[in-house]
């Protein structure tokens, strides 16, 4: 089973408590502008707000867009997690479309297939400190770049 967080899912904006919006964007490295929260590429949006690793704390995915920054995929994403002390911390960022797999790394964090155009994608696994490339897959089967 595959949890796909793609552009079709982005159509529904998650309900994020106002008190957390600013801290989520700041943790993702965005700065506030007249048009909204900006990265170096474009105005971003919180596309996912849920407990992604089953620890009882919310996590968020902040996305921004632009082929000048992200090539043919046109999407960048930043995963931020609420810590036990209530603060938010960026865990990972990349260009591409994050596909959360059922396989897991440390602390219940799901492996991420970094999707986009092509036929062989890096799968990142959380090791307790960082998401690192664990393997390459296409449609659930091993592949090589």
Residue ranges and their predicted role:
Residues 11-23, 101-145:
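Acidic, small-residue rich beta-repeat scaffolds with periodic aromatic anchors
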Residues 70-75, 117:
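Short, solvent-exposed loop/turn segments at conserved positions within beta-propeller repeat blades
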Residues 43-52, 96-111:
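Beta-propeller blade termini
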